[in-house]
Every structure is written in structure tokens, then in C-alpha cells.
């Protein structure tokens, strides 16, 4: 599916019967989450709440939810016709990350053409004026309370801005970083920026604080960017390629960007809403001193304004612990005329991140095969919170092979550094079929011999089951057939029906009355 921007994408979804306009009044507090959750679990359409109510009053704009509520809509957003076609996207990314040596002149020319398209033809196009800056709120007009930000769960500490595309640039970076990090409103012009320490935005901020201590760090947050740009921010794009370039490849046209009004950052020109501002040094007169609740640990000494974030209901199905993160002070809000507020919720799977994981699973397979060519298939079950459990099938070639694959998966892509459980099966097992996976585990595994336990590894900070926040264990399960050296016993012989008998039964089947 080809489209220009979010509005064009929504128009095409509506023609396909994949967008439902909700005209009844619906509150952004809890009601929207319950409706979206029921529709997502039923595999239903994207939802446009045209009569949203916010803070017991009509909202100034409609709210879009469940945009990526099915794998097919994720594929359409990435410019593919179906989920299976995302393997081609993965092949493209694999080639850009680690190009293989050409097999001949024709192959060499094809690779040059691909690199030219990625690195030059699809470089973002800067425009002088843009729809995202048709309306500007500055100074006292900045009021995040006017945006219909959802309160998703009863125990949430505040509303939650969940689909913000955060744009940063480190002092030594050649390109901008785009990432999606949740943000907690603190007041009319402040948000807590919850990014984990290894994410691109946090790394850019760390480098800035080291290179320019005591200087404000510019940030822009785009809401309602086109789907390719949003999805580019959650895809393992190689460091040589910007998310804007990757979005252009997906969309088939260069991403148009415009310079932010208050910084040198480039923002998506067609975004519905853009927040501009800075992370402020702690001694800036606009900064607010951190309030430390009784019994809580004080904030880390970053030299910048910090605040205690959470708790919020999260993709784990639980409320997360509170933690300290930097505060984003919003200097201005720009937007299109009649903007659409793009929102989502996270909760016990399936939710929108889980659906994204199912679709992006197809992108990961070629990337992993480039590093571990013995991989046949790879699956992240959505009920495993998108990334905490992986099942991989391999062409086993030697004793100990499964263990090599486990450690390879934990190391190849940053996306899998938090994967707690890896199950390795042979190529005759479909990793997407739990009946086959469980059969392999219960017949090909010895719990002591075939279980790998690793202590003190990086773990998602939202994982309260780990003994220490951010640090915990990993488990690998070798459910492959065992080779000499792995067992001294005679291995089981699998049962298979005689092929001649199967053909005879096929021939008589229609006469059996079954």
C-alpha cells in the first residue's frame, strides 16, 4: 500500500473497511482503552474517535487508536501487501547492515543500485513550509492539557503520551535518532521522558551532557507522523541509515522534513502535532526541583531536571515500578489544521506492541540468518510480551550447536538483549506451533543437561521478576535431537507411516464416508 501521509493512509484503510469512525462520545479516561482493547482482541479495524471527551469536556480533536492493531495493517504501513512480504524488508535491511560480496557483475550493479536508493535517492527532503506548522502555540498558550491524552488504566498515575516519535541528535552524530518513548505529563508544559539507558535518545542525551555540560538538550516529539516513519523508529535500522531514509524506502518516496522552529532538528513535515523543547539543566530557572517521596531513592546526579515516573500499566500486564527520568520542557506546540491525535494503550498481550512484534518478527528472520545462517525460522510469541521468549529452529550440524545459537541470539541485535527465554528446536519442528514445540521439549530435552542458565545479564527495567532492577538471568532450552558427545544413549527413532499406505488411504478416502 502506497500513501503520502497519515491522512492518506487512513483514507485507504477506510476504503478497505479497516477504519471505523466512532461518533458516540467516548472518554479518554479508561473508556477508550476498553473499547480499543476489545476491538484489537477481535482483530477489528483502526478506530477514529470523532467525539472524544477529555477532562469531562469535548476534546479539541479526534483520537486515532488501534492503527497497527493487526499484522496486516502493520505490513501495509511498511509498504508491503501482506505480512509474508515483510521478509523482503528484512532482506533489504540485512543487505544494508552487512552487504555480501557480489556474485558477478550483474549482482554488483544491483547492489550499487540498492545502496544508491537507500543512501542517496531516499535521503530526506527538506521543505521550507509544512502542514505540521500551520498552527503554533507558544509561551503561555502551550498547554498539554488541551491534547486528548489517554488515561489507560485505573492505577495509572496520570495520562500517558504513548505514540510520540522522539527526535534527537547527539553532538557527534551524523544523523538524527528517532525513537518511541512513553511520556508522562507533569503540567501544562512538562513531560517525563522515559527512555532506557541503551536507547538512541538516551545515548544522544548522555553524549550531549558529556560534551556540553549544563547546556539544554533540544528535543522534538512528533505525533501522527506517517506510518512508515513511525515503524522505521521501531525497526532495527542499520547505523549507516537514518529512520527517515528507511521510511522513504518503505514508502517509495523521500520523507519530507521541515526544520523545527526552535532548534536545528528536522521533524516530519506531515506530522499532525509536534512538541518542541529541551531537557533543562537543573539550575535553569525554568527547571523544577525534584520532589523525592518519603522512603524513595533520590534522583541520579545528572545535572539535569529529573522527575519520578509512573506507575503505569504496561505491556507486561502489570503496573511498573517508579523510576527517575529526565524532564522535557515544551517550548512550543505546532500542528496541522484540524489535527488528529494518535494514541494507543499497552497492557497484557495482545496489545498494539504485541501485534507489532508479530509483524516485525518477519523482518528479524533475514537479519538473524545473515549472522546465523543455520536458522530456519524464528518466532516471538506475542504472549511472551513481544520479546521475552523466543523459539528458533535450526539446521543442527554438530554437538553444542544449539547453545551457540542461544548466545548468538542474545548478542546479534540489541532488540534481543532482554529476551529471557530461548527455545531451540530442529528444523522438523515449526516454532510457531506450540503443540510441536512442547512435544520437542518433552521428548528431546533433559532438564539438567539441556538447560543453560546465565546470571547477571541485562534485563528490562520493567521486569519486576528479576532479582535486581535491570539485571537478571536468562534461560536457554535445547530441545533439539542430541548428537554424539551430547548423549551416550541410543536416540529415539521417530514414528512415520509407510508412504505406500498413505497413498492407498488417500485413494480410498472418499469411499469411507468420513
Curated annotation (Swiss-Prot):
Catalytic activity reads: a 4-hydroxy-3-(all-trans-polyprenyl)benzoate + H(+) = a 2-(all-trans-polyprenyl)phenol + CO2
Q: How does it sit in the membrane?
A: Peripheral membrane protein
What are the UniProt keywords, alphabetically? Cell membrane, Decarboxylase, Flavoprotein, FMN, Lyase, Manganese, Membrane, Metal-binding, Ubiquinone biosynthesis
The UniProt entry annotates the active site at 314 (proton donor)
| Origin superkingdom | Bacteria
What EC class is this? lyase
Which residues does the annotation say bind prenylated FMN?
Answer: 180-182, 194-196, 199-200
Instruction: Give any GO molecular function from the UniProt entry.
Output: 3-octaprenyl-4-hydroxybenzoate carboxy-lyase activity
What subunit structure does UniProt give? Answer: Homohexamer.
Q: What is this protein called?
A: 3-octaprenyl-4-hydroxybenzoate carboxy-lyase
Q: Which organism is it from?
A: Bordetella bronchiseptica (strain ATCC BAA-588 / NCTC 13252 / RB50)
Amino acid at each position: 500500500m502506497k500513501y503520502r501521509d497519515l491522512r492518506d493512509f487512513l483514507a485507504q484503510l477506510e476504503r478497505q473497511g479497516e477504519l471505523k469512525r466512532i461518533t458516540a462520545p467516548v472518554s479518554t479516561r479508561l473508556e477508550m482503552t476498553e473499547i480499543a482493547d476489545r476491538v484489537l482482541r477481535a482483530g477489528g479495524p483502526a478506530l477514529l474517535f470523532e467525539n472524544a471527551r477529555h477532562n469531562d469536556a469535548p476534546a479539541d480533536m479526534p483520537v486515532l487508536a488501534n492503527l497497527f492493531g493487526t499484522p496486516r495493517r502493520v505490513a501495509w504501513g511498511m509498504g508491503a501487501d501482506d505480512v509474508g512480504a515483510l521478509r523482503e524488508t528484512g532482506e533489504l535491511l540485512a543487505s544494508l547492515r552487512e552487504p555480501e560480496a557480489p556474485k558477478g557483475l550483474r549482482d554488483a550493479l544491483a547492489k550499487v543500485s540498492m545502496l544508491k536508493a537507500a543512501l542517496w535517492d531516499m535521503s530526506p527532503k527538506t521543505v521550507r513550509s509544512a502542514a505540521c506548522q500551520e498552527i503554533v502555540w507558544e509561551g503561555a498558550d502551550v498547554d498539554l492539557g488541551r491534547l486528548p491524552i489517554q488515561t489507560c488504566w485505573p492505577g495509572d498515575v496520570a495520562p500517558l503520551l504513548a505514540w510520540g516519535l522522539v527526535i534527537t541528535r547527539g553532538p557527534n552524530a551524523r544523523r538524527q535518532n528517532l525513537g518511541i518513548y512513553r511520556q508522562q505529563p507533569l503540567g501544562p508544559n512538562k513531560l517525563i521522558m522515559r527512555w532506557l539507558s541503551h536507547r538512541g535518545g538516551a545515548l544522544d542525551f548522555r553524549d550531549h551532557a558529556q560534551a556540553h555540560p549544563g547546556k539544554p538538550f533540544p528535543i522534538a516529539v512528533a505525533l501522527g507522523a506517517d506510518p512508515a516513519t513511525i515503524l522505521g523508529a521501531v525497526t532495527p535500522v542499520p547505523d549507516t541509515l537514518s529512520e527517515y531514509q528507511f521510511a522513504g524506502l518503505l514508502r517509495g518516496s523521500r520523507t519530507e522534513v521541515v526544520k523545527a522552529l526552535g532548534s536545528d532538528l528536522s521533524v516530519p513535515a506531515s506530522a499532525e502535532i509536534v512538541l518542541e523543547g529541551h531537557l533543562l539543566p537543573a539550575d535553569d530557572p525554568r527547571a523544577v526541583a525534584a520532589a523525592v517521596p518519603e522512603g524513595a531513592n533520590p534522583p541520579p546526579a545528572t545535572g539535569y531536571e529529573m522527575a519520578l515516573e509512573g506507575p503505569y500499566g504496561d505491556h507486561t500486564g502489570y503496573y511498573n515500578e517508579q523510576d527517575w527520568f529526565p524532564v522535557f520542557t515544551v517550548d512550543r506546540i505546532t500542528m496541522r489544521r484540524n489535527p488528529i491525535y494518535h494514541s494507543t494503550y499497552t497492557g497484557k498481550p495482545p496489545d498494539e506492541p504485541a501485534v507489532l512484534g508479530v509483524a516485525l518478527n518477519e523482518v528479524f528472520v533475514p537479519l538473524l540468518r545473515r549472522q546465523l545462517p543455520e536458522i530456519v525460522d524464528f518466532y516471538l510469541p506475542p504472549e511472551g510480551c513481544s520479546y521475552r521468549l523466543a523459539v528458533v529452529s535450526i539446521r543442527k550440524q554438530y554437538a553444542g550447536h544449539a547453545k551457540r545459537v542461544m548466545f548468538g541470539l542474545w548478542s546479534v541485535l540489541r532488540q534481543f538483549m532482554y529476551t529471557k527465554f530461548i527455545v531451540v528446536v530442529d528444523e522438523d519442528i515449526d516454532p510457531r506451533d506450540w503443540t510441536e514445540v512442547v512435544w520437542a521439549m518433552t521428548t528431546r530435552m533433559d532438564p539438567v543437561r539441556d538447560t543453560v542458565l546465565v546470571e547477571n545479564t541485562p534485563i528490562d527495567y520493567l521486569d519486576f521478576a528479576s532479582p535486581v532492577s535491570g539485571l537478571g538471568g536468562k534461560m536457554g532450552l535445547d530441545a533439539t535431537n542430541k548428537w554424539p558427545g551430547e548423549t551416550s544413549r541410543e536416540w529415539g527413532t521417530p514414528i512415520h507411516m509407510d508412504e505406500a499406505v498413505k497413498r492407498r488411504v488417500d485413494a480410498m478416502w472418499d469411499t469411507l464416508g468420513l
